[in-house]
Amino acid sequence: MSSGGLLLLLGLLTLWEVLTPVSSKDRPEFCELPADSGSCKGNFQAFYYNPVQHQCLEFIYGGCDGNANNFKTIDECKRTCAA
Protein backbone atom coordinates (compact mmCIF):
# COMPACT_ATOMS: atom_id res chain seq x y z
CA MET A 1 0.00 0.00 0.00
CA SER A 2 1.33 3.44 -0.88
CA SER A 3 2.10 6.06 1.75
CA GLY A 4 -0.87 8.11 0.47
CA GLY A 5 -3.16 5.12 1.00
CA LEU A 6 -1.82 4.63 4.52
CA LEU A 7 -2.38 8.29 5.34
CA LEU A 8 -5.94 8.09 4.02
CA LEU A 9 -6.60 4.97 6.11
CA LEU A 10 -5.15 6.64 9.20
CA GLY A 11 -7.29 9.72 8.61
CA LEU A 12 -10.46 7.64 8.20
CA LEU A 13 -9.74 5.65 11.36
CA THR A 14 -9.14 8.84 13.32
CA LEU A 15 -12.38 10.36 12.03
CA TRP A 16 -14.30 7.19 12.91
CA GLU A 17 -12.90 7.26 16.47
CA VAL A 18 -13.92 10.90 16.97
CA LEU A 19 -17.43 10.43 15.58
CA THR A 20 -18.24 7.12 17.28
CA PRO A 21 -20.49 7.69 20.32
CA VAL A 22 -19.54 6.49 23.78
CA SER A 23 -20.27 2.77 24.04
CA SER A 24 -21.34 1.11 27.27
CA LYS A 25 -17.89 -0.47 27.67
CA ASP A 26 -16.26 2.98 27.44
CA ARG A 27 -18.83 4.71 29.66
CA PRO A 28 -17.48 5.66 33.11
CA GLU A 29 -18.89 3.50 35.92
CA PHE A 30 -20.34 6.53 37.70
CA CYS A 31 -22.79 6.96 34.81
CA GLU A 32 -24.60 3.90 36.23
CA LEU A 33 -25.22 5.61 39.59
CA PRO A 34 -28.74 6.87 40.38
CA ALA A 35 -29.57 10.57 40.57
CA ASP A 36 -28.62 11.82 44.04
CA SER A 37 -29.84 15.23 45.21
CA GLY A 38 -27.36 15.26 48.09
CA SER A 39 -27.94 16.35 51.67
CA CYS A 40 -28.17 20.14 51.21
CA LYS A 41 -31.40 22.04 50.65
CA GLY A 42 -30.47 23.98 47.51
CA ASN A 43 -32.55 23.95 44.36
CA PHE A 44 -30.18 23.65 41.39
CA GLN A 45 -31.01 22.29 37.95
CA ALA A 46 -28.70 19.39 37.14
CA PHE A 47 -28.60 16.42 34.78
CA TYR A 48 -27.79 12.74 35.26
CA TYR A 49 -27.47 9.78 32.93
CA ASN A 50 -30.26 7.22 33.28
CA PRO A 51 -28.83 3.85 32.11
CA VAL A 52 -32.29 2.24 31.85
CA GLN A 53 -33.62 4.92 29.48
CA HIS A 54 -30.19 5.47 27.84
CA GLN A 55 -30.51 9.24 28.08
CA CYS A 56 -29.64 12.24 30.22
CA LEU A 57 -32.46 13.54 32.39
CA GLU A 58 -32.98 16.58 34.57
CA PHE A 59 -33.12 16.45 38.36
CA ILE A 60 -32.86 18.90 41.25
CA TYR A 61 -29.48 18.96 43.02
CA GLY A 62 -29.29 20.26 46.58
CA GLY A 63 -25.81 21.74 46.17
CA CYS A 64 -23.58 19.35 48.13
CA ASP A 65 -22.71 15.67 48.43
CA GLY A 66 -24.51 13.50 45.89
CA ASN A 67 -22.41 11.47 43.45
CA ALA A 68 -20.43 11.87 40.23
CA ASN A 69 -23.45 11.25 37.96
CA ASN A 70 -24.27 14.95 38.20
CA PHE A 71 -23.74 17.45 35.38
CA LYS A 72 -24.42 21.19 35.05
CA THR A 73 -25.53 20.87 31.42
CA ILE A 74 -27.25 18.19 29.39
CA ASP A 75 -24.48 18.47 26.78
CA GLU A 76 -21.82 17.64 29.38
CA CYS A 77 -23.89 14.62 30.46
CA LYS A 78 -24.28 13.42 26.87
CA ARG A 79 -20.57 13.85 26.09
CA THR A 80 -19.60 11.86 29.17
CA CYS A 81 -22.21 9.13 29.41
CA ALA A 82 -24.66 8.90 26.51
CA ALA A 83 -24.19 6.15 23.95
Swiss-Prot record:
Signal peptide: 1-24
Predominant location: secreted
Disulphide-bonded residues: C31-C81, C40-C64, C56-C77
Tissue-by-tissue expression: Expressed by the venom gland.
Domain BPTI/Kunitz inhibitor: from-to ranges: 31-81
InterPro entries membership: Kunitz_BPTI, Kunitz_BPTI_sf, Prtase_inh_Kunz-CS, TFPI/VKTCI-like
Site keyed Reactive bond for trypsin: positions: K41, G42
Localization annotation: Secreted
GO CC annotations on file: extracellular region
Keywords of this entry: Disulfide bond, Protease inhibitor, Secreted, Serine protease inhibitor, Signal
One example GO MF annotation: serine-type endopeptidase inhibitor activity
Entries under Gene3D superfamilies matching the protein: Pancreatic trypsin inhibitor Kunitz domain (4.10.410.10)
Highest taxon, organism lineage: Eukaryota
Function of the molecule: Serine protease inhibitor.
Family statement drawn from the similarity comment of this UniProt entry: Belongs to the venom Kunitz-type family.
Name under which the protein is recorded: Kunitz-type serine protease inhibitor superbin-3
Organism in which the protein naturally occurs: Austrelaps superbus
Lineage: Eukaryota, Metazoa, Chordata, Craniata, Vertebrata
